[in-house]
Design a protein with these regions (language model features):
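Lectin-like carbohydrate-binding module/patch detector with strong preference for beta-trefoil
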Residues: 1-156
Length: 156
């Protein structure tokens, strides 16, 4: 597990879309997809808060602040690959860890959560760019946290 600076605001990029796209809260406010990297808004600016489990963080957007966190859909106790934003709470699907993945130094992290375990990683579909969880080792699972002081924010 990697320690992340929780005092910073970030954009999240992956090696599948490289510099062209960043991860953002969708227009309906409940799902995630990759959007044009030139359109940075509060929906695509992220911050992390610590959890009560060492090395795990909650992921929030500036749009919703700490009241909403990235979570895994719990389908009657069955692990899901689907993600959504939910009220922040002590839910294992909101506990995310960043692991060093040294196959690409520009995108050094893979993200997994406590609910589905370290075998399922944050990924995006190649056709829709919608975020989901998947096993394996695919380019959409290699992530970089880019400090927001290096990006230009546009009005939404």
């Amino acid at each position: 597990m990697v320690n992340i600076d929780t005092s910073r605001i970030y954009v999240l990029k992956n090696s599948f879309t490289a510099a062209a796209k960043i991860l953002a809260l969708s227009g309906n406010g409940n799902s995630l997809s990759m959007v044009d990297a030139t359109n940075v808004t509060s929906n695509s600016l992220w911050f992390l808060t610590p959890t009560n489990s060492a090395g795990y963080y909650r992921l929030h957007t500036l749009t919703d602040g700490v009241k909403q966190a990235l979570d895994v859909v719990n389908d009657n106790g069955v692990n899901s690959v689907n993600l959504h934003f939910a009220n922040t709470g002590e839910y294992s699907g909101q506990y995310w860890r960043f692991d060093q993945w040294n196959t690409n130094p520009a995108y050094p992290y893979r993200l997994s959560n406590s609910f589905t375990g370290t075998g399922q990683h944050l990924d995006v579909y190649s056709d829709t760019y919608q975020a989901h969880l998947a096993g394996g080792d695919y380019s959409g699972q290699h992530w970089a946290l880019v400090s927001a002081n290096t990006v230009v924010v546009t009005q939404s």
